[in-house]
From Swiss-Prot:
Family to which the UniProt record says this protein belongs: Belongs to the thioester dehydratase family. FabZ subfamily.
Record keywords, A-Z: Cytoplasm, Lipid A biosynthesis, Lipid biosynthesis, Lipid metabolism, Lyase
UniProt protein name: 3-hydroxyacyl-[acyl-carrier-protein] dehydratase FabZ
One Pfam family from the record: FabA
Length: 159
C-alpha cells in the first residue's frame, strides 16, 4: 500500500541504513543520512578513505574515487529516499523490495574526489509515480559540486 511518511526522522546512522539498503561492503556507499524530507529531498554522505579497495587500481600513484561510484552513491541515497517516502523506516518491508536503476542522465564530473574527502549527496525528487522515481542533484565536497546527475529508478519485489 502506497502512502506518504511525512513524520520520518531526519537523520539515519549506518545501523539504520543497513536495515533499508541491500548493499554491503564494498558497494555500500552511504555512511549517514543527514537530512530527509519524505517525497522531497535527501542529504547523505560517505567518508572517502585511502583504505577503499578501489584505490589499489584507480590510480595507484594518484588515488581518485571513480565517478561511477559517486553516481552509485547518489543512486543509493535516492533509493533510501524513495523507499522511506513510501513505507517509512520499515526493515521488514525492506527485505521484500529492491530498487533498480532505469536511467542515468545529465551526468557531469567537475572535480576529482580523493582520500580524506567527505562526499555529500544532495538529491531532490523531480517526480514520481507509483514505484517509479526520478531524482536529481549533486555530489559535493566542502560545498563544491564534484558531480551532478539525474537518476530514474523503480522499486520492485525481491525474488
Amino acid at each position: 500500500m502506497e502512502q506518504s511518511h511525512q513524520n520520518l526522522q531526519s537523520q539515519f546512522f549506518i545501523e539504520h541504513i543497513l536495515q533499508i539498503l541491500p548493499h554491503r561492503y564494498p558497494m555500500l556507499l552511504v555512511d549517514r543520512i543527514i537530512e530527509l524530507q519524505a517525497n522531497k529531498k535527501i542529504a547523505a554522505y560517505k567518508n572517502i578513505t585511502f583504505n577503499e579497495d578501489v584505490f589499489n587500481g584507480h590510480f595507484p600513484n594518484k588515488p581518485i574515487f571513480p565517478g561511477v561510484l559517486i553516481v552509485e552513491g547518489m543512486a543509493q541515497s535516492g533509493g533510501f529516499l524513495a523507499f522511506t517516502s513510501l513505507w517509512g523506516f520499515d526493515p521488514e518491508i525492506a527485505k521484500t523490495k529492491i530498487v533498480y536503476f532505469m536511467t542515468i542522465d545529465k551526468v557531469k564530473f567537475r572535480i576529482p574526489v580523493t582520500p580524506g574527502d567527505r562526499l555529500e549527496y544532495h538529491l531532490e525528487v523531480l517526480k514520481h509515480k507509483g514505484m517509479i522515481w526520478q531524482v536529481g542533484g549533486t555530489a559535493q565536497v566542502d560545498g563544491k559540486v564534484v558531480a551532478e546527475a539525474e537518476l530514474k529508478a523503480m522499486i520492485a519485489e525481491r525474488e
